[in-house]
């Protein structure tokens, strides 16, 4: 009987200890660093074609008394080749930030377009495109940061979208 009581007491203490460490882990998680996108490739020379694309995604989450950082993602496009070649590139970025409780959140995303190829002795053409998306959300005592995004194309167009702000 004594062994059963000791075993039950040990299990109870272990359960309480684990639940406390899990709660602390949730509160301490205040948003990490977000990753950036990759860059595109370069084109070939002498009548060759070159194209590249890159994209990035960032996500951050904060809960409790913590403050979440801004999610940030970006991608750069590729450049074209020389000597009568064509070059194209595209880039896109997405960022998301979320804060709950006393924390604020902000999201930011950006993407830059690629540059076109130049003609060395021959004609060359280039095009690029870029897009960005940002989202910010805050709940409880914290204010949500503004979502911001921007994108610019090298030789091409760019677009920007601002996400929800609460």
Swiss-Prot record:
Q: Which UniProt keywords apply?
A: Cell wall, Cell wall biogenesis/degradation, Repeat, Secreted, Signal
Q: Where is this region: Disordered?
A: 105-125, 144-166
Q: Point to the regions of Gly residues compositional bias.
A: 144-160
Q: Where are the R repeats?
A: 56-62, 93-99, 132-138
Main localisation, per the record? secreted
Q: Where in the cell is it found?
A: Secreted, Cell wall
InterPro entries (UniProt xref): GRP1/2
Please list the GO biological process terms of this entry. Answer: cell wall organization
Origin superkingdom: Eukaryota
Q: Which GO terms describe its cellular component?
A: extracellular region
Q: Which residues form the signal peptide?
A: 1-23
Protein function: Responsible for plasticity of the cell wall.
Q: What is this protein called?
A: Putative glycine-rich cell wall structural protein 1
